[in-house]
Amino acid sequence: MKTAYFLIPGDPDARTGGYRYDRRIMDGLGNLGWRVMLRRLSATFPQPDAAALRAADAALAELPDRALIIIDGLALGAMPDVVAAHRERLRLVGLVHHPL
């Protein structure tokens, strides 16, 4: 089974359009045979503090080489340096459904 890691800031069960969209993508991937592993990031995104950025970096660092990583756009755009540090090792995809 193929695995994808989905990084989402805050509470993915929140009743907003963005989180609903994320859940639909995760469900759709599951229906296509993917195992989707959710990783929660700090709720401070899209304005993360230093601790949130360190935690996001650590979350990416612990994932296996060549893993497929989907990052919600709310977090992705706020941590370009963190993402850039992992771009050679991971397969990174941004899910941008509401550009900031």
Model feature map: region roles:
Residues 19-21, 52-53, 83-86:
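Short, glycine/charged-enriched secondary-structure capping and boundary segments
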Residues 10, 74-75, 98-100:
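Short, flexible active-site-adjacent loop segments at beta-strand->alpha-helix junctions, enriched
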Residues 32, 88-90:
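Helix C-cap/helix->beta junction micro-motif
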Residues 14-15, 47, 77-80:
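Short catalytic/ligand-binding loop motif for oxyanion handling, primarily in non-cytosolic enzymes
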Residues 1-43, 63-67:
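N-terminal subdomain of nucleotide-sugar transferases
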Residues 35-63, 71-73:
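A short, charged, and often flexible helix/loop element on the N-terminal side
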Residues 56-83, 91-95:
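Short N-terminal targeting/anchoring amphipathic segment
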Residues 44-45, 95-100:
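A short, histidine- and acid-enriched strand-loop-helix "catalytic/donor-clamping" loop
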